């Protein structure tokens, strides 16, 4: 079975084809980052228009180069969470294409796709596991019991980790999108030159809050002369604080469940320091294993949508006639469509 995956939840247009026998066949991605960089952030209306402009181009390219259109058995598309306008572009296109080809169409959850994306490369990855989902809009600790059965153990009460990274980067004068730039700058910083607070690490819950850390960082920036080294020192202190919080909370979740498998997914999972420290923690403290995707699968992509579609096909009701978008669709409330 071959599954066409369509991803348009935010500002990346992703198209991929996954074969259950052969694995990932095609993975095309169009990024809008250069467009939104001019505005310092994502403009939803522009994102929707660019999806509309690029989605046909990408699919036409795939079908002409690979001559594979008649071999598609299922179309999976991101139904949520995400920007309503962007989701609607992908959903409408998927349903229209499914109707024209007379094949089933399946709406899938974007965060579940991120959660399971390491399975594209790690066939040994099994349930149950603890997952740390970290992106621009989500910071969650999830207990994954089995396919479709997830419990949110901890959630961001305000800014997500990725959002905090972007806002602090902007304070330091880095260009959008700036998460990677901040990490590169932090690598040049002097460890413990500044000490930033670790919010909520002593709280009984596994929830996160990064708005206070963001405000603290803003005050440090205002009170210091910002030469390049001082910027690096601030970036280092901020990154260390965020990663400390993420791993302290994750460690508590692992102890709580008694599990030895950890998945880190979402855009922030590309962070080099987070990867290294989580690997060290799992090997040395839990004698377990951490799974994270290759960098190309950390950010939004069609491959994870196609793969999830292949897993979900047998369990979900498939209908290409109903266009479904759920901008606030939580991973613990799938009640699968």
Swiss-Prot record:
UniProt superkingdom: Bacteria
Native organism: Buchnera aphidicola subsp. Schizaphis graminum (strain Sg)
Main location: cytoplasm
EC code(s) of this entry: 2.3.1.234
CDD domains per the UniProt record, alphabetical: ASKHA_NBD_TsaD_bac
Family: Belongs to the KAE1 / TsaD family.
A Pfam family hit: TsaD
Coiled-coil intervals: none
Binding residue positions for substrate: 133-137, 166, 179, 271
Catalysed reactions listed for this entry: L-threonylcarbamoyladenylate + adenosine(37) in tRNA = N(6)-L-threonylcarbamoyladenosine(37) in tRNA + AMP + H(+)
Cofactor(s) the protein needs: Fe(2+)
GO MF annotation: an example: iron ion binding
GO cellular component: cytoplasm
One BP annotation, GO: tRNA threonylcarbamoyladenosine modification
Binding annotation for Fe cation: 110, 114, 300
The entry's keywords: Acyltransferase, Cytoplasm, Iron, Metal-binding, Transferase, tRNA processing
Role summary: Required for the formation of a threonylcarbamoyl group on adenosine at position 37 (t(6)A37) in tRNAs that read codons beginning with adenine. Is involved in the transfer of the threonylcarbamoyl moiety of threonylcarbamoyl-AMP (TC-AMP) to the N6 group of A37, together with TsaE and TsaB. TsaD likely plays a direct catalytic role in this reaction.
Record-linked Gene3D superfamilies: 3.30.420.40
UniProt subcellular location: Cytoplasm
Gene: tsaD
InterPro entries, alphabetized: ATPase_NBD (IPR043129), Gcp-like_dom (IPR000905), KAE1/TsaD (IPR017861), Peptidase_M22_CS (IPR017860), TsaD (IPR022450)
Name of the protein this chain belongs to: tRNA N6-adenosine threonylcarbamoyltransferase
Cofactor note: Binds 1 Fe(2+) ion per subunit.
